[in-house]
Amino acid sequence: MNLEGTSGGILQKEFWRNRIQYNQSQKDILQSWFQHDPFPDKAAREQLAKEIGVPESNIQVWFKNYRVKQRKLDYKCFSEKDQTQGHDQSQHLTQEYLPKEARQKQTFITWTQKNRLVQAFERNPFPDIATRKKLAEQTGLQESRIQMWFQKQRSLYLKKSRMEPMNLLVDDPNERPDATVGWHPINLFLPTDSSHYFSCSHSSSGHETLPPVLPSTQAPWDPFRFHVSQGPNVMIMQPTQAVQEGEKSDQPLIIPNHLLTLPILTKDLDTPTPFWLQYQEEHQNHKEHSGSGVPQVKSHSQPEPEHREQQPLNLGQFDISNILQRWDEICQALLAEWDPLKGTH
């Protein structure tokens, strides 16, 4: 580009034509002023022009050139420094201009520092600021970084503690907790102790079992009330649900290990009568006397014969639907006979 055809080229020519050679005293005055103010305004430049006898425009150019010269000298001195010192300084400048989040991400914890922090966390998961400052002096980390580490460690500890109960339920990692806890088969015979089990056979499956029936005298009589006692994480299956699932599958139906407590009014608590034995006897006696299909409630003032043996009851002739139907009839009959004003005693 031709400088002679532009205004910049004309000014440059005039500058070189009117260039002034400064003596040492003038340079000293200008340099001392530059140290005081590198960007003097027009009034200051006019005052300097009167002192050294140089036009104000030349003084403005001198300050501009001297600023460029000082920048080059500073850059040269910075590049000639030692490589290690220069690396440390550049890293310091980089850390200075990086945002706070980026500086925190670049801070890593060594193995020794982590061990010391873990020991402090085991002693106190919630350290105060004095403890964190003491750890910062011992580990060489910032107090804010230590505070952040403790917060993350506490959150990880809470997640781990929530997962531990599920792991304790399973001994074998290949097994599921709900498939291994609280599911046990029930014997198909009636024992002679106070826990009376009953079973039934269905046309589709002969391995279906029902939960045990126990007498209960602690709660007021309620024909629609029953109590279920079970362990943790055990699924409760109702008898109707068990029948439906048993009909759909050919596999043996196993009821969860829980007790279905039914209220049975008996006077002799040492030798209680099995519910289905009592029902069968009452049903037969009622048919002989009245011929009706609704069973009558047996008076619990009459003592049970002591010589009667409790034989295992073969309920093979009963169907599941018949058993459930008889149960509904018994509940209705007991509800009709029950007087809430008299109570159960």
Swiss-Prot record:
<dbReference type="GO" id="GO:0005634">
    <property type="term" value="C:nucleus"/>
</dbReference>
<dbReference type="InterPro" id="IPR017970">
    <property type="entry name" value="Homeobox_CS"/>
</dbReference>
<dbReference type="InterPro" id="IPR051306">
    <property type="entry name" value="Homeobox_regulator"/>
</dbReference>
<comment type="similarity">
    <text>Belongs to the paired homeobox family.</text>
</comment>
<dbReference type="Pfam" id="PF00046">
    <property type="entry name" value="Homeodomain"/>
</dbReference>
<feature type="DNA-binding region" description="Homeobox 1">
    <location>
        <begin position="15"/>
        <end position="74"/>
    </location>
</feature>
<protein>
    <recommendedName>
        <fullName>Double homeobox protein B</fullName>
    </recommendedName>
</protein>
<dbReference type="InterPro" id="IPR001356">
    <property type="entry name" value="HD"/>
</dbReference>
<dbReference type="InterPro" id="IPR009057">
    <property type="entry name" value="Homeodomain-like_sf"/>
</dbReference>
<keyword id="KW-0539">Nucleus</keyword>
<dbReference type="GO" id="GO:0005654">
    <property type="term" value="C:nucleoplasm"/>
</dbReference>
<feature type="DNA-binding region" description="Homeobox 2">
    <location>
        <begin position="102"/>
        <end position="161"/>
    </location>
</feature>
<dbReference type="GO" id="GO:0000977">
    <property type="term" value="F:RNA polymerase II transcription regulatory region sequence-specific DNA binding"/>
</dbReference>
<dbReference type="GO" id="GO:0006357">
    <property type="term" value="P:regulation of transcription by RNA polymerase II"/>
</dbReference>
<feature type="compositionally biased region" description="Basic and acidic residues">
    <location>
        <begin position="301"/>
        <end position="310"/>
    </location>
</feature>
<feature type="region of interest" description="Disordered">
    <location>
        <begin position="282"/>
        <end position="314"/>
    </location>
</feature>
<dbReference type="GO" id="GO:0000981">
    <property type="term" value="F:DNA-binding transcription factor activity, RNA polymerase II-specific"/>
</dbReference>
<keyword id="KW-0371">Homeobox</keyword>
<keyword id="KW-0238">DNA-binding</keyword>
<keyword id="KW-0677">Repeat</keyword>
